[in-house]
Design a protein with these regions (language model features):
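N-terminal, positively charged/glycine-rich alpha-helical extensions of SAM-dependent methyltransferases
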Residues: 2-41
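A short acidic, Gly/Pro-enriched loop at the edge of an enzyme's catalytic core
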Residues: 125-134
Length: 274
């Protein structure tokens, strides 16, 4: 999802966000990132990387000169997006609520333009009004408390700036539909995966996981503050375990893994314990 602020609403009163059926008190960061078994290094090693085509799409929407302005990366994790987009901006501020992630990002980054900070999207008090050109959030926006985040974002993004959120949900193994069904059962099945081994179904944090699996459709920018909203959604065919040729340009995330590496990827799931 990509959107731009309305020019006449940056400094004016903000409309309350309609939460619908969501209980704001249940919105939180991914609690899996603070569990004792979580490894920030493992997350960096086994999670997929975003391809240049995704960043080109975001920058084409943003339509701004390169190497100038400020980028704000929300839920930056190990700093993947901040490092990739740094050449396009004069300054990058990357935040994450997890201290372990911020520490890992700092270890992996040697770029004086990037500042990492432990903070949340709901409290951007360290960011000046109308000082940010582009806000991004990759695989993080389904955890935000938007009753607090939207007002903060409307405050810090300058007139003519942009916001881009994206994420990925349940992966498929190309060419292995039977394995994909096993993985589906392990993640969301109601029955035991094996004798004495339950699925991860009850361990996903809600409503965050549901928001992500529904392609962030529940993340709706307040129309009084944001305009020119665009959504790009790609859903692979899980039954055939394939990607149609006409969808190749939209299938942005690929990662080749050995079996042991795929296990490492599964261990980065917030619902995984063991």
């Amino acid at each position: 999802m990509m959107t731009k602020p309305n020019a006449d609403s940056l400094f004016g009163p903000l409309v309350n966000v309609r939460q619908g059926s969501f209980n704001p008190s249940t919105w939180a960061i991914d609690l899996g990132l603070s569990r004792s078994t979580f490894s920030a290094a493992g997350y960096a090693a086994f999670r997929p990387a975003y391809p240049p085509s995704l960043f080109r799409t975001v920058l084409a929407y943003h339509r701004a000169p390169s190497a100038v302005g400020t980028l704000l990366d929300l839920g930056c994790g190990h700093g993947l997006i901040a490092r990739a987009l740094s050449p396009e901006f004069g300054r990058v501020v990357a935040i994450d609520p997890s201290g372990g992630m911020v520490q890992q990002a700092s270890k992996l980054t040697d770029d004086p333009k990037i500042t990492f900070r432990q903070a949340s999207s709901e409290d951007l008090s360290f960011v000046a009004d109308a000082s940010v050109d582009l806000v991004v959030a990759g695989q993080a926006s389904h955890w935000f408390d938007y009753t607090r985040a939207w007002p903060e974002l409307a405050r810090v993004v300058r007139s003519g700036g942009s916001l881009a959120f994206w994420g990925y949900k349940d992966n498929i193994l190309l060419g292995f539909p039977e394995v994909n069904q096993i993985l589906e059962d392990a993640c969301y099945g109601e029955d035991e995966v094996a004798p004495g081994m339950e699925s991860m179904a009850t361990y996903w944090e809600k409503p965050g996981r549901d928001i992500l699996r529904n392609s962030l459709r529940a993340v709706v920018p307040p129309p009084a503050d944001w305009t020119d909203i665009q959504r790009v959604v790609f859903d692979p065919n899980r039954k055939t375990s394939s990607i149609a040729p006409e969808d190749e340009d939209r299938a942005w995330l690929h990662k080749r893994l050995k079996l042991g590496e795929f296990e490492g990827y599964l261990r980065t799931f917030s619902a995984f314990s063991g």
